[in-house]
């Protein structure tokens, strides 16, 4: 039986590595399409990105939108984390919560998948609760050094990649995608 082929539309090498590791029984290829940066709720953003990606690729596509949501700030920065991180770095994200006693947060990953043009878009969401801490560990992947998932003493930046790829928001969303593929 041949592997299901998935065109993952991303320009982020670290996301691609994680998706390939989690979907190891699938043939994941990367398609780098310059997608618009949409604003809105995460599910809306993922669906819009998927519609735009399928127009460019003309075949099955998978897109992702990731959020980091601070409970003390009503869910901000949320889907705009990319821009906050670019300007503030992990240290600045931690400092944003300096005036709040609530350091809890959740990482959220929304994947949107379609078989092709005119086909329905399927959305898969995963969440990982945790807290924002002073940065520790590997700084190579975004906000990983300042997010410590509940039940762990390590940040994503300190954690073994295999452990992270079992518990993360991305892993949870991709588990739902795998279930969809098994049933369709």
UniProtKB/Swiss-Prot annotation:
Class in the EC hierarchy, top level: hydrolase
Keyword Transcription: no
Listed InterPro entries: ITPase (IPR027502), ITPase-like_fam (IPR029001), RdgB/HAM1 (IPR002637)
Record CDD domains: HAM1
GO biological process: deoxyribonucleoside triphosphate catabolic process; nucleoside triphosphate catabolic process; nucleotide metabolic process
A Gene Ontology molecular function term of the record: metal ion binding
Cofactor needs: Mg(2+); Mn(2+)
Primary location class: cytoplasm
Source taxon at top rank: Eukaryota
Record's cofactor remark: Binds 1 divalent metal cation per subunit; can use either Mg(2+) or Mn(2+).
Gene Ontology CC annotations of this record: cytoplasm
Family: Belongs to the HAM1 NTPase family.
Subunit composition and interactions: Homodimer.
HAMAP family documented for this protein: HAM1_NTPase
Name used for this protein in its record: Inosine triphosphate pyrophosphatase
Species assigned in the record: Caenorhabditis elegans
């Amino acid at each position: 039986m041949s592997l299901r082929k998935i065109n993952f539309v991303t320009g982020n090498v670290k996301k691609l590595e994680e998706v390939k590791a989690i979907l190891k029984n699938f043939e994941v290829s990367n398609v780098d399409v310059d997608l618009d940066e949409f604003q809105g709720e995460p599910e809306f953003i993922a669906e819009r990105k998927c519609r735009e990606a399928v127009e460019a690729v003309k075949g099955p596509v998978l897109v992702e939108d990731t959020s980091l949501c601070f409970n003390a700030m009503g869910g901000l920065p949320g889907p705009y984390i990319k821009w906050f991180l670019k300007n503030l770095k992990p240290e600045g994200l931690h400092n944003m919560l300096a005036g709040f006693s609530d350091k809890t947060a959740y990482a959220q990953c929304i994947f949107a998948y379609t078989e092709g043009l005119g086909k329905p878009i399927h959305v898969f969401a995963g969440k990982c609760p945790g807290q924002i801490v002073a940065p520790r560990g590997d700084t190579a992947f975004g906000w990983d050094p300042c997010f410590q998932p509940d039940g762990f003493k390590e940040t994503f930046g300190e954690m073994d990649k295999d452990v992270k790829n079992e518990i993360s928001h991305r892993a949870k969303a991709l588990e739902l995608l795998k279930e969809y593929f098994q049933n369709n």
